[in-house]
A protein has these predicted regions:
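Sec/Tat signal peptide C-region and signal peptidase I cleavage site
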Residues: 16-20
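Solvent-exposed coil/turn segments that connect beta secondary-structure elements
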Residues: 102, 132-134, 187-191
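Short peripheral tails and domain-boundary helices/loops at the edges of structured domains
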Residues: 145, 183-219
Length: 244
């Protein structure tokens, strides 16, 4: 009898573990969005707790983060070690925001576009902006990946809140993750070493955690509001918040 109960308990544990680690489907994702409301939460997988290092407080009307900085899991819950059919230890180098196809992508601060690439085999369309120095003196260079139409070109000066791109459709590549989203990747490195699709996983030197540089404080991103004054060296959300 003891042996029977031991086998039963082990079976239940294995079953629960298998369920917890399975990838959710796109349908599952939309169901969760509908149940919880599609604004203002950070979606977590596998009981992963604050991989960014901060408790994140999203505005109630902001699009959700579906894979956070340093997360081990992709936008649909799969392990990042499985990307491209390869096995390696990897953490997320940026923040993934779920946004609907065609939605506006905004400049997170004043800056200068220093890189543009379309139809990248890994991430689709992407571009990079130098937002200047942060309050702690680090250079804030941000790559925007998986986008649709890009409204800026290399060398353009941009203003905070300016329309810089449209959200792209589902990226049908090894790096798309199976869900449309904006990948917002921040680095202090210069030149080609500070941006590009090969920088979004792993652990290269120079990564910066965007959650340290929000205008609302660490872990407290704010929606851009036209006409409001913001301090230099800090970022507002690159995605549009809905009206409450």
């Amino acid at each position: 009898m003891k042996k029977f109960f031991l086998i039963l308990i082990l079976g239940l544990l294995l079953s629960n573990t298998s369920f917890a680690k399975r990838n959710i489907t796109k349908s599952d994702f939309y169901n969760r969005i509908e149940e919880k409301g599609n604004m203002g939460f950070v979606l977590r997988y596998h009981n992963e707790k604050s991989p960014s290092g901060y408790e994140i407080v999203m505005p109630k009307n902001a699009p959700p983060i579906i894979s956070d900085f340093k997360s081990k899991y992709g936008v649909l819950g799969g392990s990042r070690s499985d990307y491209g059919g390869t096995k390696f230890s990897a953490k997320h180098g940026g923040i993934d925001f779920y946004i609907k196809v065609g939605s506006p992508i905004l400049a997170a601060a004043d800056g200068k576009v220093y890189g543009v690439k379309v139809k990248d085999q890994c991430v689709g369309n992407q571009f990079a902006i130098d937002f200047g120095k942060s309050l702690d003196g680090k250079r804030m260079r941000v790559t925007h990946m998986h986008v649709g139409k890009i409204h800026v070109k290399k060398g353009d000066q941009v203003k905070r809140g300016q329309l810089i791109a449209d959200a792209g459709a589902l990226v049908k590549t090894n790096c798309g993750g199976g869900m449309e989203h904006l990948h917002f990747h921040m680095s202090k490195n210069k030149g080609s070493g500070g941006w590009g699709s090969f920088r979004f996983l792993g652990g290269p030197k120079g990564w910066l955690n965007p959650h340290e540089y929000w205008t609302g404080g660490k872990g407290k991103p704010e929606c851009y509001v036209e006409g409001k004054e913001y301090p230099e060296g800090l970022l507002t959300l690159p995605v549009v918040c809905s009206e409450l």
